[in-house]
């Protein structure tokens, strides 16, 4: 087992606090991951890393930033009033862990409904493992990154998927 990280120190400290490092080490030690490689996508609330599973296949490792005030500001409105969050302490780490769990469950529901979403694999604390969408470690582009002609052909598919989900 090995961990490869090619980011600068600031990014490492932002993503890999002691608790998150412990969680990643648990995933490696329990055979959920064989390797954790570099970041493939970065956002305000999380980073997505390429991971290698025990069979040598790619997996996406989404790590929610535990120190992010942006997370608390941006997601609190979705948590208030949701019965799944009523018994969760409202400290940032607990909310982030619950948000990762909620995303895992929503991906399961969407997959069961036959939607084209990454297959959720496992969630622990603020770390979510899911199917890697891409080839040879290169993630598939977001819809906003696809040429307009190609993106427009997806519109009807997206509307249909939303109807299937709801």
Which stretches of residues belong to each language-model region?
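Conserved kinase catalytic-core segment
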Residues: 149-166
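AlphaC helix of the protein kinase catalytic domain
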Residues: 137-148
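Conserved ATP-binding subdomain of kinase catalytic cores across diverse folds
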Residues: 4, 12-139, 163
């Amino acid at each position: 087992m090995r961990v490869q990280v090619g980011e600068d120190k600031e990014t490492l400290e932002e993503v890999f606090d002691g608790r998150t490092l412990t969680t990643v080490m648990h995933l490696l030690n329990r055979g959920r991951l064989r390797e954790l490689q570099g970041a493939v996508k970065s956002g305000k609330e999380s980073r997505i890393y390429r991971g290698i599973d025990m069979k040598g296949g790619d997996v996406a490792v989404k790590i929610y930033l535990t120190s992010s005030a942006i997370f608390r500001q941006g997601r609190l409105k979705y948590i208030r009033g949701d019965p799944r969050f009523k018994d969760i302490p409202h400290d940032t780490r607990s909310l982030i862990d619950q948000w990762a769990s909620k995303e895992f469950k929503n991906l399961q529901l969407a997959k069961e409904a036959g939607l084209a979403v990454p297959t959720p694999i496992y969630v622990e604390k603020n770390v979510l493992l899911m199917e890697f969408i891409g080839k040879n470690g290169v993630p598939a582009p977001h819809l906003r990154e696809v040429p307009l002609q190609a993106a427009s052909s997806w519109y009807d598919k997206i509307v249909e998927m939303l109807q299937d989900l709801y």
